[in-house]
C-alpha cells in the first residue's frame, strides 16, 4: 500500500480540508480521468482497492496513472484507553481530496472501457467522482 518512505515528523495536526483543488485538476497524462467532485479523504486502502478494480477490468490494455498520494498520517488511540496521555499511534495514511482533484488517469483504452473501469473504481472510493475526457492534446 502507499505511504511515505520517511517523514520529517511522525504525527500531524488534524487541519481543515476546504477550498477547491488548484493543482492536478485537469487530465495531464492520459486520455480519460476520474475527478473528485466533493471534499474528503482517501485512505491508502481505498486507493489500492480502486486501482485493483481498474486493473482487473482493463486487463493488460491501457496504462493507469494514480494522481493522489496518501501523505497525511491519521492517529488513533487503542480501545478502552482513558483520555489524555498524548496523541495516539499512526493507524493509516490518507490523501486529502478537494473538488476538482484528478484521482486516476488512463490511456490506451476505449472510452466505454475507461468509463466502466472508473465506475467500478468509484464505488470503492469515499468521495463522489465524475468521468472526464481530455480536451486538448
From Swiss-Prot:
Swiss-Prot/TrEMBL GO biological process terms: translation
PROSITE patterns: RIBOSOMAL_L16_2
GO terms of molecular function: rRNA binding; structural constituent of ribosome; tRNA binding
Pfam families: Ribosomal_L16
UniProt cross-references to Gene3D superfamilies, sorted A to Z: Ribosomal protein L10e/L16
Gene Ontology CC annotations of this record: cytosolic large ribosomal subunit
Keyword vocabulary terms for this entry: Ribonucleoprotein, Ribosomal protein, RNA-binding, rRNA-binding, tRNA-binding
Endpoints of the signal sequence: none
Superkingdom, natural source: Bacteria
Alphabetical list of HAMAP family matching this protein: Ribosomal_uL16
Family (UniProt): Belongs to the universal ribosomal protein uL16 family.
Oligomer and partners: Part of the 50S ribosomal subunit.
Function: Binds 23S rRNA and is also seen to make contacts with the A and possibly P site tRNAs.
Name by which UniProt lists this protein: Large ribosomal subunit protein uL16
Native organism: Xylella fastidiosa (strain Temecula1 / ATCC 700964)
Amino acid at each position: 500500500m502507499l505511504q511515505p518512505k520517511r517523514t520529517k515528523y511522525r504525527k500531524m495536526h488534524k487541519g481543515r480540508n476546504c477550498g477547491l483543488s488548484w493543482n492536478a485538476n485537469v487530465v495531464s497524462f492520459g486520455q480519460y480521468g476520474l475527478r473528485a467532485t466533493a471534499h474528503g479523504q482517501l485512505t491508502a486502502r481505498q486507493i489500492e482497492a480502486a486501482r485493483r478494480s481498474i486493473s482487473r477490468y482493463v486487463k493488460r490494455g491501457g496504462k493507469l496513472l494514480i494522481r493522489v498520494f496518501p501523505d497525511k498520517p491519521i492517529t488513533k488511540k487503542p480501545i478502552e484507553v482513558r483520555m489524555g496521555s498524548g496523541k495516539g499511534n499512526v493507524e493509516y495514511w490518507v490523501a486529502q481530496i478537494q473538488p476538482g482533484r484528478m484521482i486516476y488517469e488512463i490511456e490506451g483504452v476505449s472510452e466505454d472501457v475507461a468509463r466502466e473501469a472508473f465506475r467500478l473504481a468509484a464505488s470503492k472510493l469515499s468521495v463522489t467522482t465524475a468521468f472526464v475526457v481530455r480536451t486538448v492534446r
